[in-house]
């Protein structure tokens, strides 16, 4: 398994995508080098932006070690679940999902269109920026993806197969404990820390 870095990600992309311009002005950056407002605040995967001036790509790799260097045991299959979820959503609402270019199961990497020309809405909304189409787009995305992946539309076997396929208790615990418990202190929450620790203990029993 290759471990991607800023130094080798361009060669990797060239080996996977035949449309990538070998002679272009190639630019590479790693998610996390920019501000939270530019990059978001993910801390699990290693993500790179690669551009040849014409194509703008996101290259995302799952590794055993989190980008944040946290003490987590990570599920290496999480990249495939994310890719599969995006693939399903792209089949339902293709205009609302980044283009999917490649999924490399051997190296646990997938490549998508980079849509960083868009702004992360939560930061913009906090500034009072309004988007007239946002509510309609969110409503259409939620309604369509929820309906067409539900038992109202799918036969029971297909629905249950999908439910089992996307179960990932390891990542769920990491997000619930890592994001909502260990990052919280009594100074920045109205919920008591004792209550949060009790919840963490409960989760360990499940």
Language model features by range: what are they?
Residues 1-108:
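Conserved NTP-binding catalytic cores of kinases and kinase-like/nucleotidyltransferase enzymes
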Residues 62, 115-116, 199:
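Anionic group-transfer/hydrolysis microenvironments
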Residues 122-157:
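Conserved kinase catalytic-core helix
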Residues 149-179:
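Coupling/switch/interface segments within P-loop NTPase motor domains and analogous charged loops
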Residues 178, 183, 190-191:
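Intrinsically disordered, low-complexity segments enriched in glycine and mixed charged residues
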Residues 194-201:
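Conserved small/polar residues in nucleotide/adenosyl-binding loops
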